[in-house]
Regions:
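Class I SAM-dependent methyltransferase SAM-binding "motif I" and its flanking Rossmann-like core
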Residues: 140-231, 274-277
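Short, glycine-rich nucleotide/cofactor-binding loops
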Residues: 57-67, 238
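A contiguous loop/helix-start segment that scaffolds small-molecule binding in enzyme catalytic cores
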Residues: 2-47, 52-55, 131-133, 197-326
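Alpha-helix N-cap/loop-to-helix initiation residues
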Residues: 65, 112, 143-144, 244, ...
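Short hydrophobic/aromatic-enriched beta-strand-loop microsegments
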Residues: 100-107, 158-162, 181-191, 255-264
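Short, solvent-exposed amphipathic alpha-helical segments in soluble enzyme
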Residues: 71-75, 97-100, 149-153, 178-179, ...
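Short N-terminal binding/cap micro-motifs at the start of the first secondary-structure element
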Residues: 64-68, 91, 307
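Class I S-adenosyl-L-methionine
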Residues: 1-59, 70-167, 172, 325
Length: 326
């Protein structure tokens, strides 16, 4: 590993290589303002390994690689190790420099490659060797990404860390599907709900997730406000594709009208994005017929009827137009 290159700001490695190949001393030839920016340590002194590395919990966004933030990109370039989930776009993984170690710690419902406790332990072990780690997560690390558990573990071992936000799945799905999450005429607020519930052991030792189910009555009360009111609440379910039939049943059972509009956005903001528009009554059957793969975001509420089909070709030719079924 070239420690000099590892320290250069992103995009300037090639400049340093070019100058070196022409026997040019970059410290003498660069303009004084750029010379000051680099400082001689970038070229003359190898980086000293700290006793403990730092950890950056970074959100990779909802799917489209171009939605990665500039700060996230810079920190990825400067990392010693990048640990990433299965939700991270492969195009973002390609941005990781070759000298940076890549560790896949993906977790997917029903197909765990690593338990959360093992991921936390691995981060600590690597950081204690003095390496700086980027922990790359899909969406935003603070929203249903279990960042709090990782922060707890790092704090226990007195390892410094920082969090870099990413565009959460709900925002990405909303924008790329043309569905507002709030609307001054019909939705004053929005609520994010995880459908991937924590399993709890009963007294007999059996796993039971029903104890951790959301307060359906409260959800329906917010979403089912008076039709002439703008106080209704938009409901957004994360990771609910496999449970969409149960989710719709729960909403109906607690009083949400079957005619309430629902949108399911599959693989939002990627080239594989699909959008299905339906109602509480029929949306589960529709997404089954369309063979959605996930991850998917489900939006419930009047805002779905305020949808506009956006021209995604204005953003990228790699993102397909949406498919609709009313």
């Amino acid at each position: 590993m070239n420690t000099e290159n590892a320290l250069l700001p992103w995009g300037l490695t090639r400049l340093q290589q070019f100058l070196s190949s022409h026997n040019v001393n970059p410290l003498n030839q660069l303009p004084h303002w750029l010379n000051d920016y680099f400082s001689k340590n970038h070229f003359s002194q190898p980086r000293k390994r700290a006793d403990k590395g730092h950890v950056y919990l970074i959100g990779a966004g909802p799917g489209d690689a171009e939605l990665l933030t500039i700060k996230a990109h810079r920190l990825i370039q400067q990392a010693d190790v990048v640990m990433f989930d299965w939700l991270v776009n492969p195009d973002i993984i390609k941005m990781i420099p070759r000298h940076v170690e890549r560790v896949f710690v993906g977790k997917k419902c029903g197909r765990h490659s690593m338990q959360q406790a093992d991921i936390c332990q691995l981060m600590v072990e690597v950081a204690l060797t003095g390496k700086n780690i980027v922990r790359l997560k899909g969406g935003d690390p603070a929203i249903f990404a279990r960042a709090a558990e990782e922060c707890d573990m790092l704090a226990q071992h007195q390892i410094d860390f920082a969090i870099v936000p990413g565009i959460t799945a709900a925002s990405g799905a909303s924008a790329y599907a043309g569905i507002p999450l709030t609307h001054r005429e019909c939705a004053q607020s929005v609520r994010f709900i995880t459908a991937h519930l924590k399993s709890v052991k009963s007294a007999t030792g059996e796993l039971n997730s029903s104890i951790e189910e959301p307060n359906w009555q409260a959800l329906v009360a917010g979403a089912n406000a008076s039709a002439c009111s703008n106080n209704r609440e938009t409901l957004v379910f994360y990771m609910g594709l496999k449970r969409i039939d149960i989710i719709m049943q729960r909403l109906r059972t607690h009083g949400l009208p079957e005619s309430t509009p629902v949108a399911v956005i599959d693989q939002a903001s990627t080239a594989q994005q699909k959008v299905c528009i339906g109602t509480v009554k029929n949306i589960a059957q529709q997404v089954t017929e369309q063979k959605f793969q996930g991850p998917a975001v489900t939006i419930v509420g009047e805002v779905v009827n305020r949808r506009h089909v956006v021209n995604l070709s204005l953003l990228s030719q790699s993102v397909n137009g949406v498919s609709e079924k009313a």
